[in-house]
Amino acid sequence: MNTALDDLHGDLVTLEDNEIINNSDHSSSHSTSHEEEDEEEDDTEDIELIEKDGNKILSSRIHPEDEIINDGLNIWIPVQMLKKNIAKFWSHFLAIEKKLTKVKCKHCGEILTRSDASLTKTFRSHLKTKHNISANKNFYSMNFTVGDSNLKNNTSSTEITRRHGYDSLTFNSDQSFKCFDIGKLQSSNYLSISQLVAIVIASENLPLNFFENVSFKSLLSKFHRIPPLTTNIIEESIIGLSKSIDELIRRSISRNDTQLPFTIHLSDSKESNQPLYLKYSREIRAQLSNLDLSHLISVNFTELAGKRSLFSLQLFDNTNKVSKGLPLSIFVRKTTDIDISVWQEQLNNLYSKYPGLQKSVISITLPQSHYTMVLENRNSHNFTFHSGSVREIKYHTCIVSELLHCFLQPLFNVPTESMLSSFSVAKENHSGGSLLDSLIDFSHIDLSSTILGKICCLIEEVNLNDSLKSDFLLYCQNYTQPNCNELTSILSCNCDRFSALKSILEKFANLVPFFKSINSHLENESLSESDFRLINTVEETLRTFEQSIEYFASSAPLKFTHTLVFIIKFELYLTEIIRSFKFTKSKKPFEKILARLLKVKDLYLLDDVNLIGAFLYPSIFQSKSLLNEIFGTTSVNKIVHNMTKIVLRYLKNFINITNFRSSNSGGESGRNSGNNLLSDYEAIFMKESRDVELLCNTKLTAPLTEDSLLVQIIRDDLLRYVNRIAHELPNAYHDYLNDNDISFDGSHFTKHELSEENDSNSGEWCLNPMEETFDIHIPISDSIWNNYISSKNKIEVIDILLQLLSVNSTSSIRSELSSLTANQDFSTKLSEETIKIKLLNSQFNLEKINFHSGSIFDAC
């Protein structure tokens, strides 16, 4: 990467004299990474050489013939059996013809198409965004067997579609359903057969009498001494399991009640000959490094359909590095209006149900509408919420609800009352749908004044005009045979779901040449050149919007390190779009989105947790503009100075120092804290200035207090972190960009894509700010944190901050809840109980749960 971040190692003055930083860790870490790369390259097979014989075994575990699938409509064949000398990314796909305009992903089964036979961006992007797989990675060199492939089952999809009822024992479960070994669970002595059957029924939204299914009875007959099952027994088992989950949560919370705040006890200083500052610092660091934060929790508040509200618990699974959530309670609201007193009453009822919760929760995340009212009322006499052991509860606005309010009204004229803070009414689950289908119901929204309304009018006119319709079908047929069915389906467009709207825009983008050709034959309003351009821009923006929603609603860790930077990058993305349009009419919806997004940014800049997250976003030190935007300066010294105050304020919520003996002697505490550690940003990162004032050269003259002691420790650790990032960031960018065929000219990232014939006729394009964020900066930041978490060289304060950020929730809207709207009837008798069982089963290891005396954290 040709950037000003190169050669930073020589510009940093470290804390080696204070024995805080060991530079050998950086070099060894980098060396190890290169060794791992070499090993990977040795293991990677050269697919171009192997593919010369289509019948040859490409792997000792996978045969190409085993991957051929007949879905009843097409025969899907591994690409290397259709074409020779192809790029490695093709090994991840199946196709039905040599043009490769339509392929099926081996990992998830999704069917992808491309409009131009020379473009492969769609396929490469799918591998990266959906599966986090580099386009340079050979499918056959990956560490799995054919049994792991989503395409192993060759059963015809049409045959499956024709099956009805439960006699077939075909489960249409969502992807989060966790399969488990009934035999193993039975042997654990914690769950009876009736409970196991209840888990299956609740997890799959099956009727209570599902156990009467002939095939299921046959399965149960394989076990000995099966007790008789009735509908009442299953119902009682579901209720009993739900109560057991509640008790499991109560036990887990009660343990936190005894831990918060974390007490750091200092030993008696009278018998020590060490300077008081050094003695206390070492004791505090030793105890900070041993703090167990794995049992901390936060609370999410979400609105469901039918005037129902859901409170859920969120924790961080340190083993699998993901956040997980469990429902606590569902409350029924009297009206759809937002009433903060009603919300507080619900919260108090929640505390009554889970007595330890009030003293153990560290933050609450709310939808945008509720968050605003909480801020307005938190200082009023009527707002009686007490945070318990945590000195100041942190409230966070749900970023997903913020994005929904920013985008939906300007683009689709969605009225505010139609934008539920969370999930819309339950409706049929559509295959290939979007998470956004469960967040907003478009069926009653008037799109006539939007660009989608124009498209619908145009399609309607084509449908009514036999001549135009005939020309359209002929165009689709000549366009490309595999895509014919998909493109012609636009004639029966349905705009009741987000995924349907997105599909219409995607198909229309492929049909622009046809609609341009018939413009002069249209009786109604035709589309102008600016309209066609607007359609392409809206389609691209919606893809980015959907990707953003799915990311922040996911279980990915450390999303708080991305929120502020993400919003600023989206602001830049929208600004570029607005500048590219000449006409006010085209600019208007994007200007509305931008105005709303700027308000969200201002709100997030007031949140200490978001500021801490931004500081801990490694890639922020790759951009002076980001530092200026968030911290108001590019001076690392000033940034660290301000962040030290913020971190101190935040950590004092959770840490209590006891047996501290203050010192009135400034000389005892007056030391060089990290002397000559760090110069300014320009000297460290940009190599433009060496004449800077070092904050760390100053000596402490004030009396030693608890706060001044913590300030020294926090500042030292923040500086150690910056030093570490400055060593690792250039290498991380260099390696990642090389691996993904991306170049950087100092201001723009350019993606270089090989054609399907490999080296010849390669293409390239400049990445927009959001593509940079999702395709470059977030993966690099996550990689740096993965390396940090797995290393032994930890930084105490940074480690604590990361654990706290992992527990806090950026969004109260979680993707695992989206399946509830597809099949869940909230009016049924066992709705809350079923939801609890379903989400427990989908996220936790049931084999590890002791429902009698265990904790929810034991099941991670």
Swiss-Prot record:
> What keyword terms does UniProt attach to this protein?
Metal-binding, Nucleus, Zinc, Zinc-finger
The taxonomy runs:
Eukaryota, Fungi, Dikarya, Ascomycota, Saccharomycotina
Superkingdom field? Eukaryota
Family recorded in the similarity comment: Belongs to the VID22 family.
Q: Pfam families under this entry?
A: zf-BED
- Can you name this protein? Late endosome and vacuole interface protein 11
Q: Where is the composition biased (Low complexity)?
A: 20-31
Q: What happens when the gene is disrupted?
A: Exhibits cold sensitivity, a significant increase in cells with fragmented vacuoles, internal accumulation of precursor CPY, increased glycogen accumulation, and displays elongated buds.
Gene Ontology molecular-function annotations: DNA binding; zinc ion binding
